[in-house]
Amino acid sequence: MKNLYDNVLQFKGKWRDYQDRVLQNSQKYLADGKLHIVAAPGSGKTTLGIELLRRLGEPCLILSPSITIRQQWLERITEGFLLPGREPEELLSNDLRHMKCITAITYQALYSAMKHYQGQLSDGDDESEEDERESEADDFRDFDIFDAVKAAGIKAICLDEAHHLRSEWWKALETFMKELKGMTVIALTATPPYDSTPGQWKRYI
């Protein structure tokens, strides 16, 4: 099968040892369609996640805890992978209603789409001051996220720090994932929920 990202994306740096080990064994790790990566902040999880998605070579959806982190994903793809002569707009989107080969959204946007919400979406950090949060207006009143995902041909999903979600966002994510069949899932975290209940741990993995 043709890889959508051939001649479009290529990592411009040098892999760290742990990244190289993961990549060399990625087919084995992804045998069940799921890969969980735990690594410290600043260790290059985002870059590794992008490379894994690039190697899968199919349309994908990246979910992040906040607008700020969502944009960091898109910036990292543009700066660290996008080949000369290619424009980010050809490949990247942050809008569920206009998905591209790589679409990055927030968990709040997913929740809002599933609830057909219209209004202002603010950044996901509850600890930040209200006037410091980034926000966006959205209207999902006539939007069917499952039809949109199917139309976009999404085959892979990357979950960034999914276990830190507020409960209603997590429930929306669970419902969303249960409805999708045959998806490859890559999950990234710096802080896995080791102190969680057995039920919470099962939900995480």
Residue ranges with predicted function:
Residues M1-V38:
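Conserved pre-motif I regulatory segment
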Residues T46-F81, T106-A109, W169, P192-S196:
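Conserved Walker A/P-loop ATP-binding site and its immediately adjacent core
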Residues P59, M99-I102, G153-A156, K181-I186:
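Loop/turn-to-beta-strand initiation segments
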Residues F81-R141:
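Inter-Walker segment of RecA-like/P-loop motor cores
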Residues H164-I205:
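Post-DEXD/H (motif II) to motif III coupling segment of the RecA-like Helicase ATP-binding lobe
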Residues I67-R97, K202-I205:
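Conserved helix-turn-beta segment of the N-terminal RecA-like "Helicase ATP-binding" lobe
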Residues D160-E161:
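Walker B catalytic acidic pair
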Residues A31-L52:
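Walker A/P-loop
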